[in-house]
Amino acid sequence: MQQVVYVANPVSGLIHVFRLEDGELVPLQEVQTGGEVQPLVISPDQRWLYAGVRPDFRVLSYPISADGRLGAPSSAPLAGSASHTCTDGTGRLFFAASYAFDHVSVSPMDDGGRVLAPHQRIDRLMAAHSVTWLAGQNGEQELLVACLKEDVIRRFTLNERSQLEPHPLGDIHTAPGAGPRHLTLHPTNGDLYCLNELDCTLNRYHREADGRISARESLDMLPEGYQGKRWGADLHLTPDSRFLFTSERTSSLLTLFGVDQEDGALTPLDHFPTESCPRGFAIDHSGHYLIATGQRSRSVAVHRIAAQTGELSLSSRHPVGEGAMWVRVLRLDKPA
């Protein structure tokens, strides 16, 4: 399996491009973005890497070459600083959440896959921290927006003009003071997971066939008796959906949860140290490695994931730019 890893370093303004080989990162390229580069997302057809940049608010569309290196980008304006981005399932639309500007924007793409200027902005989404595209088993589609300061996950549908409208079934409310931050979706069982930044809990929800979303459970991410500041960051499932990992920035811990294959219930299993202040991480497509950055570290860590238990062991560390935050992994030899 051939894989490429992209790491965004906002303080340095760099995207580091690596080849992942047996738990090691082999440098391929350093790309200067000309700004504070933060959220990264790969297009559904894997031909583009989209990078949000500030303070000149824009998105850069980088063409991805056959070996994973990035070509010269096109540039399009954004309505504000992007804290998180995603595309729809077809690669026609680009969504950007702005935590600082309390909005979500919708940008079309041209026929080649380049992001264009936004055609819609929805304001008054307090601390809109992330955008997550959800496609149901019956063809329904919606956008989930985690609004940290509202303790609400906003739900939107797309109309025939490719614009967002409030979902007729309403929004999802978290516990007061939880601070919903990032979401991830189970690929088959209808469950979705929300990492809450402020109280460091992990919520599991279930989406019914009729579109209703209901809460199933909420678990603490941190070790029993933890007394430090709570500052949750990121979460990801392994490709086989047997394990889920979260990161917390004060303790610099990665937490491992088991996912029951029958009913989806979560079980906290263990905690593992990683780079200082792990703002972002990713799991490779084989499910063998977890790649973690640290905002207060100048290195990125590659952890090996034990196949049977999910336990982490450090495989390697590699130097990167300052303030590393975002990690994305591309599989070059993905089957058609």
Q: At which residue positions do the language-model features occur?
A:
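An edge-strand/N-cap motif at the start of beta-rich repeat modules
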Residues: 1-21
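Short loop/turn segments immediately following beta-strands, especially the blade-tip
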Residues: 18-24, 62-68, 107-114, 156-164, ...
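Beta-rich, blade/repeat-based domains predominating
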Residues: 34-45, 78-94, 121-140, 174-190, ...
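Short loop/turn segments immediately following the C-termini of beta-strands
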Residues: 10, 54, 99, 109, ...
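A short beta-strand motif characteristic of beta-propeller blades
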Residues: 26-32, 71-76, 117-122, 167-174, ...
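Structural signal for beta-propeller blades
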Residues: 14-15, 57-59, 102-104, 151-153, ...
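Loop-centered beta-sheet repeat module
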Residues: 144-201
